[in-house]
């Protein structure tokens, strides 16, 4: 019996051990802000849940709420740009795109003390010329893989259900801090996915976790493990 126990102990050392499951990760992103009291409520909810998100801020909205842009950055969220005027880059000349990006960068710098790290083109619209411009501006382009169209669907239950149905490890979730229903849905989604073991990362963190290099002038929409 003693020899048998010793043999089993030796086998236990030699056999491969199971590894703890890697955390499932997603990135929550918000476009078109800041938006006054709605963004304040969202930031309060994110802080209470220990979640950092990525905000793609519009320059003209930073003009209205510079203190909120500063708060977003100060609380550890990632700040990308959504352009200055929310005009579609594909309908603009190269010079116009350059001016728009420059203005958006200047406004974010003035409000937060830091330059944008990422770009989400308005409407998600881009072409080869736009990618060339973003490369010159040193901005990777970030799209999304889950879109509940919360800017159009003002129903927190429907928005929440859509996201929970489609979210998977590596998803980049598109939302807007423009309506009460969107903010409500975002906080519900966090609660539900955290209960399922998901971890919320910024876009840059999610890309790094997946081993993806964010490249200026290149567009990415998700970062599966």
Named regions from a protein language model:
Residues 9-13:
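Hydrophobic core
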Residues 26-29, 53-57, 78-81, 117-121, ...:
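Structural recognition of the beta-strand scaffold that forms the well-ordered cores
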Residues 7, 17-19:
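Cleavable N-terminal signal peptides
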Residues 33, 58-60, 84, 122-124, ...:
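Active-site beta-loop-alpha junctions enriched in small/polar residues
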Residues 38-41, 87-115, 123-169, 182-188:
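Alpha-helical scaffold elements lining the catalytic groove of polysaccharide deacetylases
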Residues 1-4:
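Positively charged n-region of N-terminal signal peptides that target proteins for export
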Residues 48-49, 63, 181-225:
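C-terminal domain-boundary segment and adjacent tail
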Residues 19-92, 96-110, 116, 192, ...:
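Active-site beta->alpha N-cap acidic-glycine motif
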